[in-house]
Amino acid sequence: MRRTVLLLATMALTLLVASGVALAVNKIGTNGPDTLRGTNGADNLVGKGGNDSLIALRGKDNLLGGEGKDILWGGTLRDSSVGDKTLVGGPGNDSVLGGKSSDSLSAGAGNDFMVDGEYRTAVKDNLSGGSGNDVINVINVKPAGKDVVSCGSGFDRVLADRKDVLAPDCEKVRVVHGTLDEQDEQEQSWFATIPESFFEGLHRI
């Protein structure tokens, strides 16, 4: 009987995968360094302790880094990152990178690096830096989405579009304008002022 049930369950799973139905996962890391990757479903990825890398794919995903110097990525170069994401870094110097959809990004305590979307899309994201000296980049190509940024305590630096809504607690703000080439030049100039330590470990993805 148990073999029959197992066989039927295996057949059902095979049919779901073959039909393209997205299956969600829940993955929880350890107190050491972990790499957790999502699926095309709605996933929950929890890093816990250690310097973790959490990578979302399609689906409405929730990523929680926990303690440590974590990297949270709302989508990779190999997928379209469909589905709104919620990314929470937690304590530690985290890198929180949004995807193509309207994401909610929260870095937590620590000196964090945040980007609203690697793909420069025109959706609206909500970003919260938390405590610490954060670096936040929310520029997009036109038509830009109206991103909402709260920096929190600490000395924070923000690169933004004219449409973005920035809280008064963002200490150093630079607003870019002009053509895409001009925006790229301004962005490169701005990044040159950021300490290299903010970008250490990004090769883990």
Describe the predicted segments one by one.
Residues 1-4, 9:
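Positively charged n-region of N-terminal signal peptides that target proteins for export
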Residues 183-205:
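Composition-driven, intrinsically disordered low-complexity tracts enriched in small residues
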Residues 138-139, 143-181:
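Leucine-rich solenoid repeat scaffolds
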Residues 8-17:
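Bacterial N-terminal signal peptides
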Residues 19-26:
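Sec/Tat signal peptide C-region and signal peptidase I cleavage site
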